[in-house]
Swiss-Prot record:
CDD domains, sorted: EPSP_synthase (cd01556)
Similarity-based family: Belongs to the EPSP synthase family.
The species this protein was found in: Enterococcus faecalis (strain ATCC 700802 / V583)
Protein name: 3-phosphoshikimate 1-carboxyvinyltransferase
Reactions catalysed according to its record: 3-phosphoshikimate + phosphoenolpyruvate = 5-O-(1-carboxyvinyl)-3-phosphoshikimate + phosphate
Assembly notes: Monomer.
Broadest EC class assigned to this enzyme: transferase
Residues binding phosphoenolpyruvate, per UniProt: 20, 92, 120, 168, 343, 385
Compartments, record wording: Cytoplasm
InterPro entries in UniProt: Enolpyruvate_Tfrase_dom, Enolpyruvate_Tfrase_sf, EPSP_synthase, EPSP_synthase_CS, RNA3'P_cycl/enolpyr_Trfase_a/b
GO cellular component entries: cytoplasm
Keywords: Amino-acid biosynthesis, Aromatic amino acid biosynthesis, Cytoplasm, Transferase
NCBIfam families per the UniProt record, alphabetical: aroA (TIGR01356)
Biological processes annotated in GO: amino acid biosynthetic process; aromatic amino acid family biosynthetic process; chorismate biosynthetic process
Length: 426
């Protein structure tokens, strides 16, 4: 696909896609609760549709009228054995969180996905679930999908210190803990996104959070709720960066989720001197509008506790750093290696093709800026965030064309991405 290049400026207002993390979890919580859950602004991207289809295969009635999703909750005990292997597509969230839910279901389930999922490590989830009494293993005797899990109605609580900072692993353990008899304790390596904890409370459950320690006493029964999904800051990030680096730009992004465990990119932009203003903030629902304007940027260092708060935004932050004055260092981000692709290597290789001065390290990137970008042939590696990052990079190319292979990957989280960009472009 030939990407849009040499854009003079970007102007306009956008409603970015609904939050992917909350959309996944709204289906899951609706399914394991008693009664009806309605979901407004559900993200109909490929990943979240994989979650929806997965729970239908477990016997959950889910209706979609095009505006609202309605989930007829069955409770944990009402989930039924799937007739076939559950296909999670490209969704790591689906497979890892479902393992936690299935840990308490007394039947065997197989989960598989695409070629990318087949490379995603699962021991980080399987080990604690097996400690709780589930029988979970790779079908091919490795830690990689396909995965087979046989749950048990006698799950034991766990006291677990996380070896990696992963909201997916934490969430899987918490879903299992909701079904276990007794108090489970999870200690995080670093604070990660807390949508699961928030939604446990929203659906009538209880847990205690003390810094990085989470304590949950089970078993618990949840009750269906009405969920309104805000815009996804991870999708908004591409237009935040575009607005900062394309000359004479001003973009208003409406109703973006502003959960503090997800807003690390806003802190980085502020540290780099970028102009992003929060308007119409709704603190109760963790959302607001974001107004971004073209800015002069300076380099920064990114590492430590902030990394889990912006892990998915690091590819587009790397592009931002190519336009900042000085040397930006990203460290402590080794988790990027086990995303849809090795995002450290992918970002470095593809931006280098376009003229960036960027070096991969074992746990991050070193980026010298500012640099002018030029045309070239690049690939998304089938990774939606790499694909969208490269289109924003192409906006800055004044000479030559940019050809993107595997552009269709963006539909995983943002099916209308190219159309939305076209509406802003001048």
């Amino acid at each position: 696909m030939q990407l849009r290049t040499n854009v003079k400026h970007l102007q306009g207002t956008l409603m970015v896609p609904s939050d992917k993390s909350i959309s996944h979890r709204s289906i899951m919580f609706g399914a394991i609760s008693s009664g009806k859950t309605t979901i407004t602004n559900f993200l109909r991207g490929e990943d979240c549709l994989s979650t929806l289809a997965a729970f239908r295969s477990l016997g959950v009635n889910i209706e979609d009228d095009g505006t609202t999703i309605t989930v007829e909750g069955r409770g944990f005990a009402g989930l039924k054995k799937a007739k076939n292997t559950i296909d999670v597509g490209n969704s790591g969230t689906t497979i890892r969180l479902m393992l936690g839910i299935l840990a308490g279901c007394p039947f065997e389930t197989r989960l598989a996905g695409d070629a990318s999922i087949a490379k995603r490590p699962m021991n980080r989830v399987m080990l604690p679930l097996n400690q709780m009494g589930a029988e979970c293993q790779g079908v091919q005797q490795t830690e990689f999908p396909p995965i087979s899990i046989r749950g048990t109605q006698n799950l034991q609580p766990i006291d677990y210190t996380m070896p990696v900072a992963s909201a997916q692993v934490k969430s899987a353990i918490l879903f299992a803990a909701l079904q276990a008899e007794g108090t489970s304790v999870v200690v995080e390596k670093e604070k990660t996104r807390d949508h699961t904890e928030e939604m446990i409370r929203q659906f009538g459950g209880t847990l205690e959070v003390d810094g990085k320690k989470i304590m949950l006493t089970g078993p618990q029964q949840l009750t269906g709720q009405n969920v309104v999904v805000p815009g996804d800051i991870s999708s908004a990030a591409f237009f935040l960066v575009a607005g900062l680096v394309v000359p004479d730009s001003e973009i208003l992004l409406k109703n973006v989720g502003l959960n503090q465990t997800r807003t690390g990119i806003l802190d980085v932009i502020k540290n780099m001197g970028g102009s992003v203003t929060i308007l119409n903030e709704d603190e109760a629902n963790h959302s607001g509008d974001l107004l971004v304007k073209t800015s002069q940027l300076t380099a920064t260092e990114i590492g430590g506790a902030i990394i889990p708060r912006l892990i998915d935004e690091l590819p587009i932050i790397a592009l931002l750093a190519t336009q900042a004055t000085g040397t930006t260092i990203i460290r402590d981000a080794e988790e990027l290696k086990v995303k849809e692709t090795n995002r450290i290597d992918a970002v470095a290789k593809e931006l280098t093709i376009l003229g960036a001065d960027i070096t991969p390290t074992d746990d991050g990137l070193i980026i010298h800026g500012p640099t002018s970008l030029h045309g070239g042939r690049v690939t998304s590696y089938g990774d939606h965030r790499i694909g969208m990052m490269l289109q924003i990079a192409a906006l800055l190319v004044k000479e030559g064309t940019v050809e993107l292979d595997k552009a269709e990957a963006v539909s995983v989280s943002y099916p209308a991405f190219f159309d939305d960009l076209e509406r802003l472009s001048c």
